[in-house]
């Protein structure tokens, strides 16, 4: 499937726009704790879920599957959801660019990573405790 150039532009322009606090997770690891407005949540499985919602199950017959996919791509609904799809891929690309090894993870200022939680307060406490021990 070809991704339009405008979608790729949005993807790469927004890939660096996540400084601050970002929770990287998936649908199986819901966010816990209080979430302030300045925290971004990136669900790493969002692109797959959005595509599954858009395309549904395709035929096992390649020609029929191609016809179904072309029909979906030409639909107004696909065009409306294209920006959400590009944004979800941008989040995945940014997680990859940070070198995240696993998720869930809370990332502070694209520099400090706390793995294994989606709770920002708990992650901040772990980070602060670790930083206090550093010389």
Feature map (PLM): residue ranges:
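N-terminal signal peptide c-region/cleavage motif recognized by signal peptidases
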Residues: 14-16
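C-terminal partner/receptor-binding element of secreted or periplasmic proteins
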Residues: 116-135
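Thioredoxin-like thiol-disulfide oxidoreductase module
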Residues: 77-100
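Local sequence-structure signature of Cys/Sec-based thiol-disulfide redox active-site neighborhoods
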Residues: 18-59, 108
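Extracytoplasmic
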Residues: 36, 100-101
